[in-house]
Swiss-Prot record:
Domain Core-binding (CB): start-end pairs: 2-97
UniProt superkingdom: Bacteria
UniProtKB keywords: Cell cycle, Cell division, Chromosome partition, Cytoplasm, DNA integration, DNA recombination, DNA-binding
Protein localization: Cytoplasm
Entry protein name: Tyrosine recombinase XerC
Primary location recorded for the protein, binned into one broad class: cytoplasm
GO biological process: cell division; chromosome segregation; DNA transposition
Domain Tyr recombinase residue range list: 118-300
Protein species of origin: Trichlorobacter lovleyi (strain ATCC BAA-1151 / DSM 17278 / SZ)
General function of this protein: Site-specific tyrosine recombinase, which acts by catalyzing the cutting and rejoining of the recombining DNA molecules. The XerC-XerD complex is essential to convert dimers of the bacterial chromosome into monomers to permit their segregation at cell division. It also contributes to the segregational stability of plasmids.
Single GO term (MF): tyrosine-based site-specific recombinase activity
SUBUNIT field: Forms a cyclic heterotetrameric complex composed of two molecules of XerC and two molecules of XerD.
Length: 317
């Protein structure tokens, strides 16, 4: 193992032990830093050190992510992927500087490409109801149908990340209070309300599981173990196939739908930020949006001059 690989391993250990990063986050960092390390070795040889990485090498790395200097090479990564990979490299060298193993972060001045501001897809209310009620409209009864309904209800009711949902234990759900305790990113705990429809679905699902220990997983996979992210994604995609004008829908779609419907219902951004577990309000601002028609409706109802103009027009007609 060369010095670069050794330091990458130490950085990943730091993320796990000191920052309480999730396994998913650590895996993403590992993948991005291993890709960077492979590029460095291809340019500087198999035995490389963090001290051999300079601004020029990082510029070459950025060019490779964009598809290479040769225009005949493959198409590059999306801007969002390039930004994530550069952020991983910048964080890695920043850690080396903070731990006094390097004097300067060579990635600090590498500009991150601006991401396209695409609005995430969300469901309207009718589509949401169609999705959530789909398992109950099959005309069949299977144990997984009650589980799937409970999962769909909870994702939409509380805006959970899929990793938060799969990590839930029975004791995390307070059915009497209508609350659920969630372990979010970085091990941060928050308490989130659970709506009555979701509670009812959870009651029906748990009633079929008998006596449960507090530390038992709240949701099980088909083999009786804790449900995983992939299974949740598959069941969401399966039941979403019945939605008119179907498109790719993931568990995260329900999280965004939750935030959008909360905002449209009058919730303020700070409250939505707390419910989603965002550390920064700017993340919530990017995450939520209101359609133009909804904005115009709110404006017409709320702005004094808008109402006054309508009244004047009505009187003159």
């Amino acid at each position: 193992m060369d010095e670069l690989a050794h330091q990458v391993a130490r950085f990943l250990e730091f993320l796990a032990t000191q920052r309480s990063a999730s396994p998913h986050t650590i895996a993403a960092y590992r993948n991005d830093l291993n890709g960077f390390s492979s590029f460095v070795r291809s340019e500087r040889g198999n035995t490389v050190s963090t001290k051999t990485v300079d601004h020029l090498l990082l510029r070459l790395y950025l060019a490779s992510l964009n598809g290479g200097l040769d225009k005949q090479q493959r198409a590059g990564y999306a801007k969002s992927s390039i930004g994530r990979k550069l952020a991983a490299v910048r964080a890695f060298f920043g850690w080396l500087v903070r731990t006094r193993q390097l004097e300067v972060n060579p990635a600090e001045l590498i500009a991150t490409p601006k991401r396209e501001q695409r609005l995430p897809f969300h469901l309207n209310i009718d589509q949401t109801v169609t999705l959530i009620e789909a398992p109950g409209h099959t005309g069949q009864e299977q144990p997984t149908f009650a589980r799937d309904t409970a999962i769909l209800e909870l994702l939409y009711s509380s805006g959970l990340r899929v990793s938060e949902l799969t990590g839930l234990a029975v004791a995390d759900l307070d059915r009497a209070a209508g609350m659920v305790r969630v372990q979010g990113k970085g091990g941060k705990e928050r308490i989130v309300p659970v709506g009555s429809a979701a509670l009812e679905a959870l009651e029906q699902y748990l009633a079929g599981r008998g006596q449960l220990a507090d530390d038992a997983p709240l949701f099980l996979g088909c083999r009786g173990a804790r449900i995983n992210r992939r299974t949740v994604a598959q069941l969401v995609k399966r039941w979403a196939s019945g939605i008119p004008a179907f498109r790719s829908i993931s568990p995260h779609t329900l999280r965004h739908t939750f935030a959008t419907h909360m905002l449209e219902g009058g919730a303020d951004l700070r409250s939505i930020q707390e419910l989603l577990g965002h550390s920064s309000l700017s993340t919530t601002q990017k995450y939520t949006h209101v359609g133009l028609d909804r904005l115009l409706e709110v404006y017409d109802k709320a702005h004094p001059r808008a109402r006054e103009t309508d009244q004047q027009n009505g009187e003159s007609a």
